Amino acid sequence: MRAVVLLSGGMDSLVTTAIAAHLGYELAALHINYGQRTEKRELVAFQKICDFYRIERRLEINFEHLSLIGGSSLTDLAMPVTTAKLHSKEIPTSYVAFRNANMLSVAVSWAEVIGANKIFIGAVDEDSSGYPDCRVNFFQAFNELIKHGTKPDTRIEIQTPVISLKKWEIVIKGMELEVPFEHSWSCYKSEHVACGVCDSCALRLRAFEQAGIRDPIEYKIRPSYI
């Protein structure tokens, strides 16, 4: 069994990678650079995680178009990365328009060429930033798209093993699978020491705190979000 895993280097994609490895898949790891502020640090995390799981087949793709399109504080340096508002129902400025569809398109192309029948992605729906392309119905629709846009004998299905989990449950799952959380990177602002106040840092810190486990990475400040 062969599978492509979309591996950003964050905690959700790390745990998803661990789940896929635990299921016995031969993994091919895909990493997308799209002009994000922490691009270099995320790539380091990707390589460390691949090394940990001994993933030999790796593909790094550069997406210039998402940063050229802009509209996100992750890719547009003129837009500030906002401080986390975890109870807000608004989609944060860190949303990159239709990012997952762009990434999944590459994953499907690669999967079809190398004969992988699964694509794993660490999307989280319920306990996350509220990005529209992380919803269950989005991935259901994309699976239908794959059926209609690939060769008749191609059988590729997207797997989202953590999509319905709370973030703290993802931490617990990761601990059960003995994942190297210290190799992962979630901060949207900094490539050196995690800021502790962006949306991604806040969600991560809250998850570890709710799980009763100290996050092993270093933070500039480490607020409580409970």
Curated annotation (Swiss-Prot):
Catalyzes the ATP-dependent conversion of 7-carboxy-7-deazaguanine (CDG) to 7-cyano-7-deazaguanine (preQ(0)). Signal peptide: none annotated. One of its GO terms (molecular function) is ATP binding. Pathway: Purine metabolism; 7-cyano-7-deazaguanine biosynthesis. This is 7-cyano-7-deazaguanine synthase. Pfam families: QueC. Its cofactor is Zn(2+). Its EC number is 6.3.4.20. The keyword Metal-binding applies. Keywords: ATP-binding, Ligase, Metal-binding, Nucleotide-binding, Queuosine biosynthesis, Zinc. Binds 1 zinc ion per subunit. NCBIfam families: 7-cyano-7-deazaguanine synthase QueC. Belongs to the QueC family. It is an enzyme of class 6 (ligase). ATP binds at residues 7-17. Zn(2+) binds at residues 187, 195, 198, 201. One of its GO terms (biological process) is queuosine biosynthetic process. InterPro entries: QueC, Rossmann-like_a/b/a_fold. It catalyses: 7-carboxy-7-deazaguanine + NH4(+) + ATP = 7-cyano-7-deazaguanine + ADP + phosphate + H2O + H(+). SUPFAM superfamilies: Adenine nucleotide alpha hydrolases-like.
